[in-house]
Amino acid sequence: FNRLSHGYNVDLPYASQGMVGRFVYGYDTRYLAEVNFGYNGSENFAKGKRYGLFPSFALGWVISNEPFYKKSNISKIMNSLKIRGSLGWVGNDRVWAYDPVANTSTEARFIYLQQYEYVDTSNTDNSYIFGIGDNRVQGIRQGRVANKDVSWETSRKLNIGLEAGLFNNALTFNIDYFHERRSDILTQVQTMPSYVGTVFSPANIGIVQNQGVELEVNHSRFIGPDFSYSIKGNMSFARNKVIDMGTPLGVLPYQRPEGYPIDTPLKLITLGYFQDYDDIERSPSQLALEGNTEVHPGDLKYKDINGDGVINSQDQIAIGYTNLPEIMYGFGASVNYKRWDFSFFFQGTGRYGIEMID
C-alpha cells in the first residue's frame, strides 16, 4: 500500500509505503498457529534505512479438546483449558526532536537532512547586525545537525497466556505474562557539548524494558428463566526499566536513569527534623537549597549523599514511584431480572507517586 496524507497547515505531504501479510492455520480445533508480517517504509529515514520488516508468530493449544483430557476426571471440573503464546516485532518511525528556538520537543521530519533556520529580524538575540548602527537583517543559520544513520525504532513483544473455564464455564479466568523490550529508541542525543551551538538529531540509542502480568476472573449464572447475575474482576502489574538512554558520562552514578523506571523522580532523603540550633550547626549546610535563606529548629534535615558538607541538587537520588501506576485493578457485578438490569464497576490504582507541594 501507498499512503499520502496532509497535516494541518503543512505544505509537504506525509508519505509511507508498506506491505502486510497473514497466514492462519488450525487443526482439529486443538492446534492453532498464526504468522503475520509487515514490511514498512518511512519518509523520515534516508535511503537504505527507510524499510523495516516486522514479523509476529502466535501458537495456541486447546488442551481441553484432546482425547486424553476429555477422559480425565479434571475435565468434569475444568471443562475448557487453553494455553497460547506470541512473539512479535513492531516499529515506530515517529521522531521527537528538541527545537532550540521553541525550547521544547516537537515532532520532527526528515531528520536525515541538514536543517537550516530562518533568523527573524524582530528577535534581537538571533538577528545579524551589518554596517553602522543597529541595522538588523534577516538571515539563515545552521539548525539541527542531520543524522543519516537513523532508522526504525523496534519493539519486541512476548506474551504467554492461559485460559480456563470451570463448572461449564460458570467461572472463567485468563492470566497473561508479557515482556516488551524496546530498542533503538529514537532519543535526543545528550552528549553533544553546548559550545557546538546547535543540537544533533535524535539517534537510535535508547533501550527500555517492560514486563508484567494480567489476570481476569468472571463468574456468571442463570437462576431460572428471568434472573441472572455476573461478577468480574481484573488486576494487572507492570513495571518498566531503563536499560540505556544515552546518558552523558558526567551525570552522577546515583542520578543516572538506567536501572530505574522511566521518569523516576530525583529527590532528597530526609533524616527527620532539626532539634535545635546546635543540631543545625553540626549538620551540612542547607542554605544552597532554593528558597532556603534561613534554617530553624523544626525544619526538615536532609542527607548529604556525596559528603561535601552542602545539601544541594547533587544530593538528590532516584526514590519513590513514578506518576504511572504499576498496579491497576477493578471489580464489579451485574444483576438482570426480566427487562431490568443493574450493574456497577470499581477501578483503582496502586504503587505510583504523587508530588505534594506545601
Give names to the regions the model predicted.
Residues 1, 79-88, 230-237:
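Extended hydrophobic secondary-structure segments that form protein cores and membrane-embedded regions
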Residues 1-4, 13-45, 50-67, 155-158, ...:
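Surface-exposed extracellular loop regions of Gram-negative outer-membrane beta-barrel proteins
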Residues 6-12, 46-51, 71, 96-100, ...:
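Outer-membrane beta-barrel translocator domains and adjoining extracellular loop/strand segments
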Residues 7-11, 23, 45-49, 71-73, ...:
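Outer-membrane beta-barrel proteins
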Residues 7-10, 143-151, 186-192, 199-208, ...:
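Extracellular/periplasm-exposed beta-strand and loop segments of Gram-negative cell-envelope proteins
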Residues 42, 295-297, 349-358:
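Extracytoplasmic gating/loop element in the C-terminal half of outer-membrane beta-barrel translocons
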Residues 70-153, 172, 176-208, 251-252:
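Solvent-exposed loop/turn elements at secondary-structure boundaries
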Residues 97-114, 119, 222-323:
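Conserved small-residue
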